[in-house]
């Protein structure tokens, strides 16, 4: 029975992936940060692990546990993440650092910790990026930058892990039904205040936080499509799944930069001078 470690399984994409892989016959190690989410996963029959993806010692202990119990790891899905929304200068370096700690640094930290067990099984690393890493939008600069970094790291890891027969897949989801927009909206509201120079544009900021739920693909469909890709004899390097996952990168590549930015500024209320 193949073994899959999936991070960030409390809801949305992560939970759908855990359900789908479990139903396909995988032993699923599903991680979550909060104790109540771990309890819910355990109640659903998962091997649930309470894990902060930036906790190095905990990652090392989990890798050793996987080695002892299963002898290796077939699939690692780096899914844990969130979207920091709002003007870059309102959030500043601190907000950017928090975003990168979860969305970027943890990808390297988790993969590094799991390298020994991935090597034993000649496993597959699946990094969940986003079309936001290809098409950059205002009021999501930190999130877009973090996902662009995940894409670059995936390419580097693919080449560096090839000698060990470990494969790396990059996933660029479009709009997927989840709690992402709700959480992103909460992040934005924490930054919004009347002293911000961008206060008059607050509705545009809120609109960007909700944009990921524009005609979203069900998370279960996303998970089923990703499972098919993972189970291929030669898993693809890049997988795009969900509403907008193909059209938006195409727009980013074909439209002149100035025209694209003008359209995005208009959509999110940045057309007028302040």
Segments predicted by a language model, with ranges:
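C-terminal beta-strand-loop-alpha-helix "lid" module of Rossmann-like NAD(P)-dependent dehydrogenases
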Residues: 162-213
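Residue(s) in the substrate-gating loop at a strand-loop-helix junction
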Residues: 130
